[in-house]
């Protein structure tokens, strides 16, 4: 609008790179008005990435795009929570705690939108399957521009056998074919012209859900989701093999539920206990639940979408940290991790 252009003119003239928060309609226009300057999307909606990256690729003046946001955070509570009970976002709804709009959730787990972004950037050639929560099928939910879809990469929905399910496949290919237990559910167009997304509707049936990319009739990639078995196990992975005795160094312990074959179980819920002894302390423990009321320094948390995350901090003296982790009701399956703490 001419009035907006007039208001922005003074600040635009004073900068070499013009940055806009959410004014994405001006990215190309500013480049035309100021041909010797560059434009940058300094804060944009996650769901707009397919459209905005096309703008970046089509103009030498548009440098790139920063989404809001990469990692979830405490505050602006409820901005991205999917309400199915009539509540509105940004409504100060207790017990909302996090914004819940990060490509990566508070437990460090990548949400589906991050894989869509990876595909849009051209960094991933395999398709990616995300299933809209089957237990919420047909229910109306609130939504803000910071939200994409309430979906997760899971084909484990106990108790919902035969119930309708919506499957989204993110893909840069011309076509995507979806298979359920070897049976084709059809092919659909994908790629840039369709927002890098193809959606299928089926009914939940335990087994294997597989998506296949086709470019010019040739297969270019696959992605599959498998239903987790009934036995629920806990997998724990530490991101550090040793720490420095500086009172600050951290080791993050990622925990997720899985079956005996290692298939992630995002639908399962278990309470996890952690005990830290020796040359370090428990810095924090928690999950990505945006409405949890538990304390982040508590030694017991429930998984959320199958995941939890703990941070162990080294003390100021060399030695060894002993971390013991177990699921409630399965105390006999305790896992012990030893982390050496060496000199600074």
What does each of the following model-derived ranges do?
Residues 222-229, 333-344:
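Short beta-strand elements
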Residues 175-183, 269-283:
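Extended low-complexity, serine/threonine- and proline-enriched intrinsically disordered segments
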Residues 188-190, 232-235, 275-291:
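Short aromatic-acidic-glycine turn motif
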Residues 215-220, 328-336:
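Short acidic/polar inter-strand loop motif in beta-rich domains
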Residues 205-209, 251, 317-321:
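Exposed beta-strand face motif in extracellular beta-rich ectodomains
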Residues 198-204, 297-316:
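Short, hydrophobic beta-strand segments
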Residues 1, 9-248, 260-265:
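Substrate-binding clefts and catalytic carboxylate motifs of secreted carbohydrate-active enzymes
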Residues 213, 257, 325-327:
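Conserved structural position at the C-terminal beta-strand
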